[in-house]
Regions:
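Zinc-dependent metallohydrolase catalytic domains
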Residues: 53-56, 60-108, 112-126, 138-362
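Acidic/polar low-complexity interaction segments
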Residues: 1-64, 68-72, 80-84, 139, ...
């Protein structure tokens, strides 16, 4: 894996439609900035924020971080270059011509700028990078996208899956955990930092994505998206169900630690903080008494959730991908890893969205 800080580079794919114009590797004859070198101490602490060196170092560190996290949960190393013959994965941190976008392929990731603003490079946004790396992880773990009737649902699943890769990755940072809990006072069934993961430019449309993880979309309510070919909107029920599962696992961990009573967790399920202020006040009082315990519960829930996803995606290489099959794989993963500890939560979350969990699928 290496960074190429290319100068005046044209995107590998057409920003208008996503079709490939040319492919990596970036030719050595084309202009580029000098590579970042370690200090005499062997670290990379010296690049100044706002500089191209900082962007390059940050992009590399972010990709490596996401891979390290998910290789741990998957239990194996991931090769990023496939069978292309290209020996190294290429990271291009600043591609102005890409505009307000970021994308990845079998051999590379290249990143543009939020609002086309050169002061807002996506290469310094871990959410964006983790989402793009998520696409690569899913392709390597599950396999290539099939052609035919299952193609659309697989692509839609991968948009949700890439956001979940980002969600889990970001929750490995203590500052994020602390900030989320401080802002929500421990009640995560709400619109917050976590529930807005993946909310950046959507595909090639240039429209701001509204992919809130905390929402009530069902398969019936997004049926029009399938007819319109909108994989982002169609993914919302799957994404919302997965977020519900994470939060309910977190609340189960709080109950197990004696930090909240079980009846509060039961009342909290998908109840908004704004619509149910009494529940928020109860959470706030419990959180104030032991914020560190809440943080530990969220870390434990994140690990449980990531293991379920990793196991379900490994199964999907054999079962194939539909929303129902992936939901069933998550239930089967829980039976295998946790003896069905979260089975009721998983079935309820997917049933609420109109996604069928088939008992016994593994």
């Amino acid at each position: 894996m290496y960074v190429v800080d290319a100068i005046r580079k044209e995107p590998y794919r057409d920003p208008a439609n996503g079709n490939y114009i040319w492919r990596p590797p970036y030719p050595k004859s084309k202009p580029r900035e000098r590579p970042v070198r370690p200090s005499s101490r062997g670290d990379f602490d010296h690049p100044r924020p706002g500089s191209r060196l900082f962007s390059a170092a940050t992009a590399y560190a972010s990709v490596r971080c996401v891979l390290d996290i998910w290789e741990f949960y998957l239990g194996r190393r991931l090769s990023l270059v496939g069978k292309s013959g290209q020996r190294k994965f290429e990271i291009i941190p600043r591609v102005t011509a890409l505009g307000d976008n970021a994308w990845s392929g079998e051999w590379y990731i290249e990143l543009g700028f939020a609002d086309r603003n050169p002061r807002k490079p996506y290469c310094e946004n871990l959410d964006v990078i983790a989402h793009e790396v998520g696409h690569i992880i899913l392709k390597h773990v599950i396999g290539p996208t099939p052609k035919g009737r299952l193609e659309f649902e697989r692509k839609s699943h991968d948009e949700a899956g890439a956001d979940l890769v980002s969600l889990v990755s970001i929750l490995h940072f203590d500052r994020v955990v602390d900030a989320v809990l401080e802002r929500t006072r421990g009640k995560l069934f709400s619109v917050n930092i976590l529930s807005q993961i993946g909310e950046y430019r959507m595909g090639w449309s240039g429209r701001r994505a509204a992919r809130l993880l905390f929402q009530n979309k069902t398969m019936r309510s997004v049926a029009h998206a399938r007819r319109a070919g909108d994989k982002y909107v169609y993914a919302r029920p799957l994404l919302g169900a997965a977020f519900d599962i994470l939060v309910e696992i977190y609340e189960a961990r709080l109950v197990g630690r004696g930090l909240i009573p079980k009846e509060l967790a039961n009342r909290s399920t998908h109840a908004t903080a704004r619509g149910h202020p009494a529940i928020r006040r109860e959470f706030a009082a419990q959180f104030k008494a032991n914020p560190d315990g809440f943080a530990d519960a969220l870390r434990e829930a994140t690990a449980d959730f990531a293991r379920l996803l990793a196991t379900a995606w490994r199964m999907a290489r054999r079962t194939g991908v539909t929303f129902s099959r992936v939901a069933s794989n998550i239930a089967a993963a829980d039976a295998r890893l946790n003896r069905g500890r979260y089975g009721e939560t998983i079935h309820r979350a997917f049933a609420r969205r109109g996604i069928t969990v088939r008992v016994g699928r593994s």
